[in-house]
């Protein structure tokens, strides 16, 4: 194989292009680009300079395919296109991290304070942050609650409760839900909390101190003590008075690396405001330069729909600015400026996203190392040949044999792989038989379209009866995968779980051991996904049956309503005009639908 590879290199052109490394059964192992194809492919023969991962890859290469391009820009775009469509196993892997956490204050009449991650909804919330960690958000919210007595309950709870909750009893909320505070006074507290989050602590402290002195002069010592306590809690909040605004639409990027992992941080500004930030993790990148990593990332991030802003700021060590500009223009037909920081404001923003990316990378690596420790213990306990890279966990859910759903969740060395979760709708005739349900799920999993992906370990939510079912399915399909069944103990308390493995006595683990807690986490995640999937299926059927009762709503209109609103509750909250906007729904029919669903309010879903 290596001799054949060397022969191909000899005939390779010294021009710009893209190369595709192909292994056994025409499997695409790697796709790369180069200014000089012959020179780049020759580099792979310098084994002493290659990482272990790339050495293993080269040993599997049977042939190399070459695509000559006009220039580097065309090569960059073609490489990105081929990687997206073919997903080679040895290429850089891009994973979204959790977005950085923010504090939100809602635009409700009685605003709620909460932690938030995700896309911004500026018509619903005011955003403050981002914060470096969820713990920082939690501590800040707690101090703001104590200082300003703001509510954290949901809007639904707020509108329906008749008495103050525990937050009021422990002096963390002023109970606006039951009029323990006037709307004006509550909104003043909200404004002071907002000023604090914007770094105006001194002004807020001055206001509180002035009010405390006034109460004291009027001998209202009880109220003076309240403001004294507010001042104390306010001093615990250390907000950075950094200006998170930018005059132009712009994205700021950082690249932080350690070993084979990189974190690219993105801080976005649109309409002169902070539009959110998120870390992306790049795996298998030790053989790539920072310029290669960032340019590849950018042509994957932006597209004609998700268009880049007019300005993109990158660290000073990024040199291929012109190539990135030209590639983004070719991709979006939009002129983009890729810039280095020119003033203190721009440098501050680049430093901010760099520091947050550094924190995210450190947290990611810490989590990874902790996971590896647990997986090594799991390997020993269940006598696995290697530390598992892919664990699949199975669970079923139904109510009296109805809306039966089986699920598979997947965990790897870095945590849950939610994009690989699967749901299995169970056949009706099984009627709640858990053993038959598990047989069907496993049979479909290992004979379906992902049958070639073999996990390193299976964890089944079940007892000794499930062991023979799993064994039988795997034997019939000629698949060898180690597995264990995990059942709750006699009292069904967490920590008393029993494990059942073929050819071994049942056993348990110490309730506080890391492995037991990890296995409980896996089982609970599968259970959560099963319950959620079952509930969605049940709600969908209930939704369909509710609409079937309405004269004039046939299968086509029912499908349109289901697609548009998703639930009966959402229809009941909609306006007449919104229902009319659904294709095929007239004003008269919209009135009938709205009247019908509102008459059914309170029906359990």
From Swiss-Prot:
SUPFAM superfamilies tied to this protein: C-terminal UvrC-binding domain of UvrB, GIY-YIG endonuclease, RuvA domain 2-like
Single biological process term from Gene Ontology: SOS response
Keyword terms: Cytoplasm, DNA damage, DNA excision, DNA repair, Excision nuclease, SOS response
Family in the record: Belongs to the UvrC family.
Main location (coarse class): cytoplasm
Protein name: UvrABC system protein C
Matching PANTHER family: UVRABC SYSTEM PROTEIN C, UVRC/OXIDOREDUCTASE
CDD domains, per the entry: GIY-YIG_UvrC_Cho
GO terms, molecular function: DNA binding; excinuclease ABC activity
Pfam family, one: UvrC_RNaseH_dom
Subunit structure: Interacts with UvrB in an incision complex.
Subcellular location: Cytoplasm
Disulphide bridges, residue numbers: none
Gene3D superfamilies, A to Z: 5' to 3' exonuclease, C-terminal subdomain, GIY-YIG endonuclease, UvrC, RNAse H endonuclease domain
Organism field: Wolbachia pipientis subsp. Culex pipiens (strain wPip)
GO cellular component, one term: excinuclease repair complex
Job of this protein: The UvrABC repair system catalyzes the recognition and processing of DNA lesions. UvrC both incises the 5' and 3' sides of the lesion. The N-terminal half is responsible for the 3' incision and the C-terminal half is responsible for the 5' incision.
Domain (UVR): residue spans on this chain: 202-237
Domain GIY-YIG: 14-92
């Amino acid at each position: 194989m290596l001799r054949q590879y060397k022969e191909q290199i000899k005939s390779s052109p010294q021009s710009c292009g893209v190369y595709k490394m192909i292994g056994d059964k025409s499997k695409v192992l790697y796709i790369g680009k180069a200014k000089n194809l012959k020179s780049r492919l020759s580099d792979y023969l310098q084994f002493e300079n290659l990482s272990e991962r790339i050495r293993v890859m080269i040993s599997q290469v049977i042939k190399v395919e070459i695509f000559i391009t006009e220039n580097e820009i065309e090569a960059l775009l073609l490489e990105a296109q081929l990687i997206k469509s073919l997903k080679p196993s040895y290429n850089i892997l891009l994973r979204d991290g959790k977005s950085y956490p923010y504090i939100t204050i809602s635009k409700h009449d009685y605003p709620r304070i909460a932690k938030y991650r995700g896309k911004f909804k500026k018509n619903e919330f005011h955003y403050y942050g981002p914060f470096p960690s969820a713990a920082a958000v939690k501590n800040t919210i707690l101090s703001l609650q104590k200082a300003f007595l703001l509510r954290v309950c949901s809007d639904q709870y707020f509108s329906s409760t008749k008495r103050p909750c525990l937050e009021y009893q422990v002096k963390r909320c002023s109970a606006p839900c039951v009029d323990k505070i006037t709307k004006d006074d509550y909104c003043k507290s909200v404004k002071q909390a907002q000023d604090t989050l914007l770094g105006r602590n001194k002004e807020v402290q001055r206001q509180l101190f002035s009010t405390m002195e006034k109460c004291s002069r009027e001998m209202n010592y009880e109220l003076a003590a309240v403001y004294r306590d507010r001042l104390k809690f306010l001093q615990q909040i250390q907000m950075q008075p950094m200006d998170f605004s930018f005059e132009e639409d712009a994205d700021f990027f950082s690249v932080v690396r350690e070993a084979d992992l990189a974190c690219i941080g993105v801080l976005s500004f649109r309409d002169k405001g902070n539009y959110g930030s998120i870390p992306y993790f790049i795996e298998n990148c030790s053989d790539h330069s920072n310029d290669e990593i960032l340019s590849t990332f950018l042509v994957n991030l932006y597209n004609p729909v998700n268009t880049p802003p007019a300005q993109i700021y990158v660290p000073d060590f990024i040199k291929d600015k012109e190539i990135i500009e030209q590639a983004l223009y070719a991709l979006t037909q939009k002129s983009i400026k890729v810039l280095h920081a020119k003033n203190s404001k721009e440098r501050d923003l680049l430093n901010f996203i760099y520091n947050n990316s550094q924190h995210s990378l450190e947290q990611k690596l810490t989590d990874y190392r902790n996971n590896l420790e647990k997986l090594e213990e799991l390997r020993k306990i269940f006598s696995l040949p290697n530390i598992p890279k892919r664990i699949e966990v199975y669970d079923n859910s139904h109510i009296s044999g109805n809306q039966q759903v089986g699920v598979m969740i997947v965990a790897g060395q870095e945590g849950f792989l939610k994009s690989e979760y699967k749901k299995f709708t169970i056949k009706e005739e099984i009627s709640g038989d858990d053993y038959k349900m598990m047989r069907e799920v496993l049979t479909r999993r290992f004979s379906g379209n992902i049958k070639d992906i073999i996990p390193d370990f299976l964890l089944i939510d079940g007892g000794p009866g499930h062991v023979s079912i799993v064994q039988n399915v795997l034997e019939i399909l000629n698949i060898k995968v180690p597995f264990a069944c995990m059942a709750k103990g006699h009292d069904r308390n967490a920590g008393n779980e029993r494990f059942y493995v073929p050819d071994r006595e049942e056993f348990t683990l110490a309730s506080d051991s890391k492995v037991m807690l990890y296995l409980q986490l896996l089982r609970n995640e599968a259970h959560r996904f099963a319950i959620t999937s079952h509930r969605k299926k049940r709600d969908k059927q209930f939704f369909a049956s509710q609409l079937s009762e309405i004269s004039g709503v046939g299968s086509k209109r029912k499908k349109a309503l289901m697609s548009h609103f998703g639930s009966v509750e959402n229809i009941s909250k909609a306006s007449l005009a919104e229902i009319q906007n659904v294709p095929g729904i007239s004003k008269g029919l919209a009135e009938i639908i709205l009247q019908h669903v509102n008459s059914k309010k309170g029906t359990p879903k």
